[in-house]
């Protein structure tokens, strides 16, 4: 039904809770939606948080790519829900993006820049590298209908994507 088409009564029925019980914890449907989006953002940030400064830079970045692709495999609906919020201009999430995503993004781009400066990986703009990883992994979830039509009948689409992205980013990042 989507956000607009879903009522608190439907949420209560689906969750197995009474409407008054839900309203005890949440002020309304908007509050539930923002809470869900925040939980999704925390889940999506976990793979980025796991980039280790003391690991092999190329392998750390490739492992991040694979973790993002695995999230695409496991949580395609959640990816689309979060993407829809961003596509709408992040009306509910802008403060949370600034407080949660921005500091982590700045920290990890500084780490990647350190690896670039040390000559551990090729010269890249760390911000655009992260954007590229997001777009090339989440595409398979966010545009699942398109991928399904264009690769109809093929098994292992995400396995093929994993091998392709590994090769692409390895070539890009090898000094």
Spans of features found by a protein language model:
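Hydrophobic alpha-helical connector segments
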Residues: 49-78, 126-133, 162
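Helix-turn-helix
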Residues: 1-31, 35
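Alpha-helical structural segments
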Residues: 14, 31-51, 59, 63-70, ...
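Short alpha-helical scaffolding segments that buttress acidic/His motifs in well-ordered protein cores
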Residues: 65-68, 82-85, 133, 137, ...
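Amphipathic alpha-helical segments used for helix-helix packing
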Residues: 73-95, 143-149
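C-terminal peripheral helix-coil segments that are non-catalytic and often amphipathic
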Residues: 70, 74, 106-122, 136-175
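Short coil/turn segments at alpha/beta junctions that flank glycine-rich nucleotide-binding fingerprints
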Residues: 1-4, 54, 75, 118
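All-alpha amphipathic helical-bundle segments outside canonical DNA-binding/catalytic cores
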Residues: 59, 95-99, 116-132, 160
């Amino acid at each position: 039904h989507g956000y607009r088409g879903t009522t608190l009564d439907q949420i209560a029925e689906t969750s197995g809770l009474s409407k008054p019980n839900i309203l005890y914890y949440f002020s309304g449907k908007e509050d539930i939606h923002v809470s869900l989006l925040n939980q999704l953002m925390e889940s999506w940030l976990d793979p980025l948080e796991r980039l280790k400064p003391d690991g092999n830079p190329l392998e750390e970045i490739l492992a991040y790519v694979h973790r993002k692709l695995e999230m695409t495999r496991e949580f395609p609906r959640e990816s689309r829900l979060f993407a829809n919020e961003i596509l709408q201009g992040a009306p509910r999430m802008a403060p949370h993006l600034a407080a949660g995503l921005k500091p982590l993004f700045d920290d990890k781009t500084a780490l990647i820049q350190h690896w670039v400066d040390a000559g551990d990986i090729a010269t890249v703009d760390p911000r655009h590298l992260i954007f590229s990883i997001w777009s090339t992994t989440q595409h398979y979830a966010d545009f699942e209908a398109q991928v399904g039509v264009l690769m109809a009948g093929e098994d292992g689409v995400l396995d093929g994507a994993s091998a392709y992205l590994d090769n692409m980013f390895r070539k890009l990042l090898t000094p």
